[in-house]
Amino acid sequence: MATTNFAALTSEQKTAWARDLWRVARNTSFINQFAGKGHNAMVQRIESLTKSEKGARAVLTLVADLEGDGIAGDATLEGNEEAMKAYDTVIQIDQLRHANRLQGRMADQKSIINFREQSRDKLGYWMGDRLDQMAFLSMSSLPYTLNTNGSTRATNVLSTLDFAPAANVAPTTNRCVHLKSSGVTAGTGFAAADGVLTATSYKDIVNLKAHAKDNYIRGIKGTGGDEVYHLFMTPQGMAQLKLDADFIANVRHAGVRGDKNSLFKGTNSVMVDGMIIHEFRHVFDTRGAASGSKMCASGNTEGQRMLLCGAQALGMADLGAAYWDEDYFDYNNQPGIACGKIFGFLKPQFKGNPANPTLLEDFGVITVDTAL
């Protein structure tokens, strides 16, 4: 039987609601503020597919630095040119969806809440939050079967996405360190001996920046040509850093006086020695992990996995805005709203790092395991 629904949206209205939802998702997404189209972005956004003999794919291109010394004086340059080495990395894409469904007309009458507006806000927040979780798990080389507090997810939905397997690839040899009393040490905190992990100090921040530069992690060019790095840690990790005596002294004396000083403002980000330090709840930690699955040899040490990020630390296939669909059930008594997005994440790797030209390395991120 044909039905007429005067509340149904036109295609133009649906497009407007979809754009509104994606605006909410982008505004609430933490990782989105670090995304850009160019090679100078921490998260490089790929917004179009590249056609090839294998079909249309989301391709992230990494270009290695030149290795040769060129030609001196009037020596012949022709025939001695150096070929640029470019590495194409394909980002797998998939679709993630969610929906709300109203109980019925009477439930709607009893509520003053606008169903469309609430769905837009709640679904938009959900989408932004899931993008954040997957982005940080990908950069941390951890599977989508985990929550960012180390506990196991209630469902395996995220781990079935086509790009999920790329997240569960261990950090490469020169891109994983942990903090000990002796300083920055190679290897992950999960493989460290019991009792050696330490919390982050001001000295560690300075040494981590030097470690990134020594290992050719390309920083993000700022105004004046200076390179900066982003360092992400948990709120608890930031609290420990703010209690470090050297950190307190430097912020107190180098910062502005009065209530605008970061010690008093309670800011979520602070600049230290060319490193912008951010606290974020979805930086991975082990507080929710079962005993034996935490850090160090016995798996019983609480820790966090900080992320030291330069340019192109993460690739994101961002193919169009989210979409918005509405449907009605039970003779139009129960309206439902669904949203979805096609996207993908990948922590890029390449060969050609001047320190180890033949070794496959994570391109722009170092994992830093510390105690909590």
Named regions from a protein language model:
Residues M1-I93, N353, T358-L372:
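N-terminal "assembly arms/tails" that initiate or stabilize quaternary assembly
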Residues A2-W22, Q109-L372:
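Core alpha/beta structural scaffold of self-assembling particle/tube/pore-forming proteins
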Residues G55, I93-Q95, D226, N332:
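Short, solvent-exposed loop/turn segments at the edges of secondary structure
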Residues A58-T61, R101, H230-F232:
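Structural recognition of the beta-strand scaffold that forms the well-ordered cores
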Residues L62, G104, S119:
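Glycine-rich, histidine-containing beta strand-loop boundary motifs that form or position
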Residues Q92-K110:
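Extended, low-charge hydrophobic alpha-helical regions
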